[in-house]
């Protein structure tokens, strides 16, 4: 029961567009859940982009995605190393927003 109440206060984690509210722990957990949702969309879009790509595009796409993951992780680590509890929120929002942006970018590849 308590976990359900906490999740409800932390925003509707089922809606990736809804904001995360609550205390720091609840907001961090909400951001993790939203990042996981966007990561799932990203992985689906990536697999579809690989499938739709002509053979000559596949290796560059794989390389770009590997480098993008490294960049995202390093970039968000920078925010996570800040001072205070806000750094955890900054890092979580960094992961969520960068993952969302990349997912939407890859989803758009099929429309070009």
Residue positions per predicted region:
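Classic N-terminal secretory signal peptides
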Residues: 1-9
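N-terminal alpha-helical modules
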Residues: 8-112
